[in-house]
């Protein structure tokens, strides 16, 4: 609150809840790889779809036809991501995110659906930082820490090393 005199109108940007846009797509695809639902070379269709009134679109409003998962992630295509979430089940994605301390996701879990993967949820910079650190740590999640310590707390396996490798290969192109 800008007019709150107790904090001088300051906002902690790292703790502010914001919609994450497409930043959850790497986690989704890694989870699909782990479940054996998809591989980077799996062909998906990027065509108009409608899920009971929910019709996701790509940012450019175009459809690309047949695309690989790798290409879908490289180009941040929305429709293949929604299809991937439908295959995986949004409940499984919500549970994984809850397990690594996505607090707003835990709070809103009953309201979330397929739009979750396109940013239809709330996350914080701290939560996303923790998630993306797992891609640099062989799929292991480490809770963000802002002080140097000899002890590592709150570690858990987010994705397998194999899926982690595939996602890192795609994201590094």
Show the residue positions of the predicted features.
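Flexible glycine/proline-enriched surface loops and loop-helix/loop-strand junctions
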Residues: 8-14, 65-66, 74-81, 110-117, ...
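Extracytoplasmic
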Residues: 23-24, 39, 44, 64-67, ...
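Active-site SXXK
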Residues: 17-44, 72, 131-135, 167
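A generic secondary-structure signal for well-formed alpha-helical elements
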Residues: 31, 35-40, 51, 88, ...
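Conserved catalytic neighborhood of penicillin-recognizing serine enzymes
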Residues: 38-93, 152-173
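A short, well-structured edge-of-sheet supersecondary motif
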Residues: 1-7, 95-96, 100
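Mid-domain, small-residue-enriched loop/turn segments at the edges of structured enzyme/sensor domains
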Residues: 55-58, 89-132
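A penicillin-recognizing enzyme superfamily signal
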Residues: 2-13, 24, 124-130, 134-173
């Amino acid at each position: 609150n800008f007019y709150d005199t107790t904090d001088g109108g300051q906002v902690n940007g790292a703790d502010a809840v914001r919609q994450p846009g497409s930043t959850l797509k790497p986690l989704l695809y890694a989870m699909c790889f782990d479940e054996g639902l998809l591989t980077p070379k799996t062909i998906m269709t990027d065509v108009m779809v409608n899920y009971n009134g929910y019709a996701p679109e790509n940012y450019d409003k175009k459809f690309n036809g047949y695309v690989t998962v790798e290409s879908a992630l490289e180009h941040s295509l929305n429709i293949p991501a929604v299809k991937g979430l439908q295959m995986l089940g949004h409940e499984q994605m919500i549970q994984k995110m809850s397990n690594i301390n996505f607090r707003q996701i835990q709070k809103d879990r009953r309201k979330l659906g397929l739009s979750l993967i396109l940013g239809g949820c709330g996350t914080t910079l701290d939560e996303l930082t923790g998630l993306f650190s797992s891609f640099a740590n062989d799929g292991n999640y480490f809770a963000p820490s802002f002080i140097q310590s000899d002890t590592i707390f709150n570690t858990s396996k987010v994705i397998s090393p194999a899926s982690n490798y595939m996602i890192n290969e795609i994201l590094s192109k």
